[in-house]
Amino acid sequence: MTKTAAVIGGGPAGLMAAEMLAKAGVSVTVYDAKPSLGRKFLMAGKSGLNITKDEGLEALLEAYGAHSEEMRPMVSMFDSSKVKGWVRSLDQPIFIGSSRRVFPEAMKASPLLRAWFARLDELGVICLARWKFKDFNGGGLEFDTPDGPQTVQTDVTVLALGG
């Protein structure tokens, strides 16, 4: 029987969690309170969408200062080369600027986000906007939705609530 996952939050962390879960064979639904998903990602793209730096692991970790060792396991699993590879896997060419920052050639977020949504759709991920998470209730998740209150049962819940 296929496991189900609810990802609450449609920003980059939630979308990445949805992608990884779907690739692992989990049936995923992403819920977001806003009218559309990826809104902060689009805002970040207004300044060119610096996606990573073209640096090795140790140089990347230096950016985390006193927290570099705490971040090492995560950054090691998804380092600069993997971030660049992920963007390229969405058929989005990249370039490396003089500061070693890496950008999509389009210099904006919308083409990358559209390609990401297309991939999620191909993986069977369902994305629901205007579903505001309210509470956990008896093993279910309570949402306020455009059609009124809804309760969702799921095997796994990922909270990707952003900041």
Q: What is the meaning of each model-derived region?
A:
Residues 3-30:
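N-terminal Rossmann-like FAD-binding beta1-loop-alpha1 element of flavoenzymes
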Residues 10-11, 32-34, 45-46, 53-54, ...:
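Fold-independent oxyanion-binding glycine-rich loops
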Residues 22-46:
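Glycine-rich FAD pyrophosphate-binding loop
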Residues 26, 92, 125:
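Short phosphate-binding/catalytic loops that engage adenosine nucleotides
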Residues 66-71, 88-114, 154-156, 160-162:
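Helix-loop-beta segment of a Rossmann-like dinucleotide-binding subdomain
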Residues 110-111, 116-163:
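Predominantly flavin-linked oxidoreductase catalytic cores and closely associated redox partners
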